[in-house]
């Protein structure tokens, strides 16, 4: 019973960490990386499709992404979707190939992205703490129903705190790596 609660909490905290990784990957750095375009949706075949499902995205060089549409008729729609996204990118089309140069980040935009990364990391920490709170509430409920002793509850709460501390440290580490990446010139 206690192990199920801890295991569930650990899984949910792990999902929060995965969400953090996805969110941090979508924050643009000076280098070209296909995940930057994950949020771009392209109107194709009657619905909005993620860009990575309608085109192949590759890194051409450190500052350029190369996009080749699976269907050449979608090239114009892909280019327009990238331009209208809030990423501040300006694609250029050459036949069926679309190149997306990554503009160099100014000091101001670096600081803005760093602030955004800190906000995303703080949201992840809050999510991890909410999972801990839910698990502690379940433990308290079991103790109140006399299904576990107070000692078992306290021991499980201490173990939950250790698990939480580990995940918070992982969040801090991911943020540190992203900040270093953002501030590298």
From Swiss-Prot:
Entry-linked Pfam families: RRF
Matching CDD domains: RRF
Domain of life: Bacteria
InterPro entries: Ribosome_recyc_fac, Ribosome_recyc_fac_dom, RRF_sf
Keywords: Cytoplasm, Protein biosynthesis
UniProt-annotated location(s): Cytoplasm
Coiled-coil intervals: none
GO terms, molecular function: ribosomal large subunit binding
Primary localization: cytoplasm
One Gene Ontology cellular component: cytosol
GO process annotations (BP): cytoplasmic translational termination
NCBIfam families from the UniProt entry: frr (TIGR00496)
Family: Belongs to the RRF family.
Purpose: Responsible for the release of ribosomes from messenger RNA at the termination of protein biosynthesis. May increase the efficiency of translation by recycling ribosomes from one round of translation to another.
Record-given protein name: Ribosome-recycling factor
Native source organism of the sequence: Ectopseudomonas mendocina (strain ymp) (Pseudomonas mendocina)
